[in-house]
């Protein structure tokens, strides 16, 4: 058994950092050591920022984004085309699409995908909120931007079924060859999707 080299407070910091996606135990130890060595410049301001975030962060009641205001910054942006809603699995997907800045639309965060094996059904996701938004009118297009997994496909089909009969165009993100991608390195599923979604040039 490894000997303890720090007090319980630093051990707790390491354990909590290790729970952050992308940080394993070793990375968490390095991050914790870096933080405590730069206590005034990093640890103090980080603790303060995290405390403030803990007090102020809310889930947007309209789209499901995280922000310090409700409705969120995205939903209150008057320059957005609110007749187009991009449906995403998670807030991280919303942020990724915003970085691309390709479509100045509204968003709707589902909070995951349908997964019967994991016990995740329609009531566990923000699907009813989406159906209600479309039912209110004013939405001409729904862009379903979920991952190209079995669960993502199942979720997309379920949403399409729920919106049947409503006057809304439903589209999906194109799947296929990434920009700068070489065909030899792509899997068969990606190549098949790319061939089926081919466009005229």
Swiss-Prot record:
* SMART domains assigned: TOPRIM
Pfam families, per the entry: RecR_C (PF21175), RecR_HhH (PF21176), Toprim_4 (PF13662)
Named from the GO MF annotations, one term is: zinc ion binding
Question: Which keywords annotate this record?
Answer: DNA damage, DNA recombination, DNA repair, Metal-binding, Zinc, Zinc-finger
Q: Which domain of life is it from?
A: Bacteria
PROSITE patterns documented for this protein: RECR (PS01300), TOPRIM (PS50880)
Q: What protein family does this chain belong to?
A: Belongs to the RecR family.
- What is the recorded name of this protein? Recombination protein RecR
Task: Identify the coding gene.
Answer: recR
């Amino acid at each position: 058994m490894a000997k303890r080299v720090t007090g319980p407070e630093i051990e707790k910091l390491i354990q909590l950092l290790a729970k952050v996606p992308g940080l394993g135990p070793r990375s968490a130890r390095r991050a914790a050591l870096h933080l405590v060595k730069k206590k005034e410049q990093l640890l103090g301001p980080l603790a303060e920022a995290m405390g403030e975030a803990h007090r102020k962060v809310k889930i947007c009641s309209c789209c499901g984004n995280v922000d310090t205001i409700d409705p969120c910054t995205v939903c209150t942006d008057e320059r957005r085309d609110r007749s187009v809603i991009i449906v995403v699995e998670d807030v991280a997907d919303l942020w990724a699409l915003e970085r691309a800045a390709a479509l100045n639309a509204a968003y709707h965060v589902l909070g995951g995908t349908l997964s019967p094996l994991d016990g995740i059904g329609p009531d566990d996701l923000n699907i009813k909120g989406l159906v209600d938004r479309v039912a209110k009118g004013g939405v001409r297009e729904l862009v379903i931007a979920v991952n190209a997994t079995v669960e993502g496909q199942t979720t997309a089909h379920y949403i399409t079924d729920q919106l049947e009969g409503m006057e809304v165009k439903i589209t999906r993100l194109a799947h296929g060859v990434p920009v700068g991608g070489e065909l030899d390195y792509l899997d068969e599923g990606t190549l098949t999707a790319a061939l089926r979604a081919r466009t005229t040039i």
